[in-house]
Every structure is written in structure tokens, then in C-alpha cells.
């Protein structure tokens, strides 16, 4: 994304922005990272919960430790075993983050924690953000506002990734589309290397499910159109726009309904992304 297309925030630091009720603020530096494709939906949800709990000016302080009730992590994990797996995944994942000036840093997503300490305070988890990551976030001025209820409703990590990516762009003035090379778009969605290699499979198992959930549950609409070089799809054009009042009401109503049966309810309410002839 070019500098001219970045959301303008009047140089307000991201960590000084106060989230509204029912939302979290996520620095743009943590939305489109490279190297996170192996993180599951549960891993990504956990990271968002830990980030939301630590969010604020203190997040930029090196070696600052945070404490959260394990019960607050139940929205992402039903068992301690799976929680341990996700904690370890975040600790061992090294991602590449791009700074506003185009330079990059390679950092871990999660630092020290006491989850395995038998003497830790019962029911609580202490953790830290790696100092290199904390330093990088200190001067962040670009962010997305994410609705917590929407984040909790997604059943696909591809939907979560697409929602976050568009949420950081939807506040842009006079910008409603952006082009991505296909490899960059795969990275944005979190598609693992070697999986969904043809565009037909990528469309069927990642793009369409993501569009279905994002368009049904969020307060904006998203389109993804393929772009070809010759007969081969080599990129995509993403488009977005805010929903009208009726569209927002419909999304809110769906969020209040049981998750069971949701796919059947929303299938057919979102236009097909591609004509059949462009599928490989």
C-alpha cells in the first residue's frame, strides 16, 4: 500500500486511540504481516484478545508485563491443552512487519508468559509483548477498528483476515479499491504455502467462504475480482464500501442469531464472486 493511500489519523498515535464500546483498535502493522500463514483461527483470536487486553500507551513499554484472567480466554479456547498450543504457536511464529517508510522488521508475536508455571496465580495468565514488537508499535499511527462481536462470529481464518484487512482501509477517503498480486493476496488471507495452489481451489475454499461471512456479518461489503495475465489469474482487485442502514441492521440481526444454521441462512444473499469461465 502506498503512503498516499494510508488512512490519515492526524498523526495521533494508534496506542493513544480509545476504542469504543464493543470494539478493539488494532495497529495496521499487525494486520498484514508475512509469515503468519500457519496460525489457526484460534491462534489469531487469542492474539487479538491478548492484544486488546494490553492495548494502550503501556503496550509500547519494553518488558512491560500484562495479566489477564484465563476465563477471559475462553472465547477462543475451550480447553487448557488447546490454549497451550496457541500460546506456543504465537511464541514461535516469526513474522515480517512493514514499517510506514517501507522498511521491515522480523519479530515474534508473543514473548514471555507464565502459563506453564505451577506456582502462577490460579486462574490468571501473565504475558509480555516482545520488546522489538513493542518498540515498532510505539510510533504507529495507522489502525483498524474491529467489532468484537463480528470477530467472534467468524468460522474461517480467511474471513477474519479479510475483515481486518478491509477494516483498516474502509476509513480511507476517495479510495475504494486496491490491487494485489495473487501471492500477496494469498499471504494476506493466511493461506499456507503449498495449499490451495490453483486459483479455482483458492476461490472455492478461501475467497468465497471469506466473502460470505464478511459480507453477511460486517458493516461493509467486499468484492474480490480476479485479474488475468493471458489466461492465468495473477492478481485480484479488492473493492469495499460501507453498508446502508438496512444493510447494517441485517448484519446485526444475523449476529444475534445462533451460529447453527448460519451458512444456510446467508448462502444466496451474497452475489457470486466470479463467473464460471474464470475459474481454473
Residue ranges of each PLM-predicted region?
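Charged, alpha-helix-forming regions
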Residues: 2-280
